[in-house]
Amino acid sequence: MIKAVHLTHYYNKDLALENINLQINKGEFICLVGESGSGKSTLLSLLSTLLKQTSGQLFFEGKNYKDIEDIDSFRRTNIGFIFQFHYLINYLTVKENIKLAKEKATHEEIYNLLKILKIENLIDKYPNEISGGQKQRVAIARALINRPKVIIADEPTGNLDSKNSLNVFEIFKRLSEGGTTIIVATHDKDLAKFANKIYEVKDGKIS
């Protein structure tokens, strides 16, 4: 599904990633573990087309990223993003926050997705009326509403307690079993055990 070949990236003259070779298959649950500043977030940004690599090649389903004409459309169609901070808009309901990602999403479509995440009762609630763990599930729903082939999550449980963190990774596991490719950066090696593959990122290299 996603293949990185000799991927290298610099920020100005500072080396962030060096000679990364990586194959990620459909439905795999991949965890990138490592300390802050190790290169995890940079790698996620490159894999998701948010950054353009300094050198090397990236492929999605066999097609070179550089040959994709409308990169914004590609990203919206194929990739869902989840971050440490959920970025929900407080004056919009849960339903309205999700519709930001897909304006034409129906009530039934949103309700069914929230039901999978066990928060369907929150559909008309506002963010300030729900817990941190529930907010992150809403963020997951928003990432899933376009039925992306890949979910990319950067420290998605950084602000959650252990119970809610566990719940989020259980959701990721179920999604991967359903065929969605999951790529998560985390510093929590215990949570990473949910993944099919774990890569350690250190000083811009993976092992």
Regions inferred by a protein language model and the residue ranges of each:
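ABC ATPase NBD coupling module
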Residues: Y65-G80, E177
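Conserved ABC transporter NBD signature motif
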Residues: G56-K66
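Conserved signature/switch motifs of ABC ATPase nucleotide-binding domains
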Residues: K125-N128, I145-N146, G178
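Catalytic Walker B motif of ABC-type/P-loop ATPase nucleotide-binding domains
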Residues: I151-D154
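Helix-to-loop junction immediately C-terminal to a conserved catalytic motif
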Residues: S48
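Conserved ABC ATPase "signature" region
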Residues: T106-L122
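Conserved ABC ATPase signature
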Residues: Y126-Q136
